[in-house]
Each structure stands twice: as structure tokens, then as C-alpha cells.
């Protein structure tokens, strides 16, 4: 049996560019790709915190250190500069792989400052 699990997440990153006339994709600061484990051309889901839009695209490498989140092509209709987004990548894992499974999550502060990294989400309290 396989399970589809959250592999990586960039939490509340701010969109820095929305470029309609660009080949579709989402450019992400290369340092964040490396830290999160998201691969270039990997399918990603983007959840727009500000307008509720949810869409699928793929990651491309943005300039390292740029703090870039550029939503490109048709996806530029789903997010505008300044919107806060959650970017997730998922993967299939076998039962054996799940024994040591931990996602990589990067949490962003305003201005796309990396505030912390984690591999677990705290239990939500009632």
C-alpha cells in the first residue's frame, strides 16, 4: 500500500511577481527549493490565503536569495503581488518509507523572511 503525503510546504509566502505573459509555472527562490526539497519542474499545489483560490502548477528555480515567488502564465489570474500563499508538494510513500517519514516545511514572515523550518505541525487544540 502507498500513501500520498505532504512532502514539502512553504507556508504563507508572499507573491512577489504575477506574470501573465510567461510560460506557466511558479518561480521559487532557489534556496527555498533546496531547503524544502521541492524539485525544479515538480508539480505543486498553491493555496491562496487571501482569495481562497487553489491551483496546480509546477516549480521552476528562481534566483537564489531573491525571496521570489512568481506566479506565471494562466496561474497569474489566481494570485496577485502581495497575496499570501501556501505552496505544497505531495509524494507517494510506501509503508516502509512512512516509518521515518517527515515533511519539510518552511514558514515565512512578512517580506518573505524565512522565520523557521519544521517537520511537524503541532496538534490543533479544540
Swiss-Prot record:
GO molecular function: aspartate 1-decarboxylase activity
Protein name: Aspartate 1-decarboxylase
Keyword Cytoplasm: yes
InterPro entries in the cross-refs: Asp_de-COase-like_dom_sf (IPR009010), Asp_decarbox (IPR003190)
Recorded family membership: Belongs to the PanD family.
Role this protein plays: Catalyzes the pyruvoyl-dependent decarboxylation of aspartate to produce beta-alanine.
Post-translational modifications reported in the UniProt record: Is synthesized initially as an inactive proenzyme, which is activated by self-cleavage at a specific serine bond to produce a beta-subunit with a hydroxyl group at its C-terminus and an alpha-subunit with a pyruvoyl group at its N-terminus.
Gene symbol of the encoding locus: panD
Cofactors, names only: pyruvate
Pathway(s): Cofactor biosynthesis; (R)-pantothenate biosynthesis; beta-alanine from L-aspartate: step 1/1
Reaction catalyzed: L-aspartate + H(+) = beta-alanine + CO2
Compartments where located: Cytoplasm
Subunit composition and interactions: Heterooctamer of four alpha and four beta subunits.
